[in-house]
Amino acid sequence: MTQTSTLNRPSRRFARLALALALLAVAPIALAEIHIGVILSTTGPAASLGIPEEQAIKLWPGEIAGEKVRFTVLNDGSDTTTATKNAQRLINEDKVDLIIGPSVTPTSLAVVEIAGNAQVPVISLAGGGAIVLPQDGPRKWAFKLSPTEPISIGLVLDHLQKNGKGKSVATIGIATSYGEGFLKAFEAIAAQRGFKIVATEKYNQTDPSVTAQVLKIITANPDAVYIFAAGTPGALPQIELAQRGYKGLVYQTQGVANNDFLRVGGKSLEGGYMTVAPVLVAEQLPESNPVKKAAVDFVQRFEKAQGANSRSLFAATAWDALLIVQNAAREALKKGKPGTPAFRSALRDAIEGLHDFVGSEGVYTMSPSDHNGVDARSQVMVKIENGAWKLQP
């Protein structure tokens, strides 16, 4: 016997109408979900940056500006080709509203090219100025939070001059866009300020030794050595300098400022200097420092989750990216729904309009010509003493 429906035709029409209305009611909720793509280097040479960044992301809430938020986190393995594929997937398949990351300059440059052409905003966690300069083409959709090279370089030269240690400097940097960017900026600024560069050396992130380069530096007998590197590979030149008995000053960029760097370099790092984000020495900051409150708040949140002394300025950069997205989303939601070109464009515009926004690493003021937005307040000088960071006056 054939089973028939017990619903009469009017009842069936009513059921179909009710179902259609229910689906319409659900659709705006699904559409309103903010989807953020994240590309990090959690393996490879830059893993000491990407791992704490990922740990910070786990602290992010599931809601932004009253809307549900979904994160899709991908590992690029510190590889430009993988970062490119990740960006293509996030944009073309996942339809993300914004990308945070990648962790380092070379991968960020690759992602910015793709995302900018697709008109998807990017907040890079890397340091190279080339990510946002010049402000044209795809870079109009790119932002970065770490300070540009001139801010760090200026602080190093001020410190060297203040300590009366002479004016001859040797440099050694990784052969990537990060190292090249710092070298180019340093050459220009050093010349303007009357410093003499007596040696310029380079090495690859995967090189097992820099003995040849360091011997050339020691032969040049500089008053200071400035190392341009990111991640644990930055410890290699400083270890070699210590083993060769170099007695001058050694400076690093904040690209190496993490606990893995301290572990790998050990006692060879003692007495070295570097410019870093204030969050790394949050409790040591004077009360007058405008970022102290936000920096201490982040450190407490992060170390509650990861343990004492686990703080990381790279994690703090990821945290500040969230704070900025939260702020921008409030404005963007007034102009478009998540998942639409209007929302992505409004997000970009809201980030660009940021003014005196205090984060854990600095005070951000963006503009059409400045997609970095930080000033000298984003960097402090620290010295490595007894395996820890010590704020310098």
List where the protein language model places each region:
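Extracytosolic ligand-binding ectodomains
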Residues: 2-6, 17, 21, 32-393
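N-terminal signal peptide c-region/cleavage motif recognized by signal peptidases
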Residues: 26-27, 31
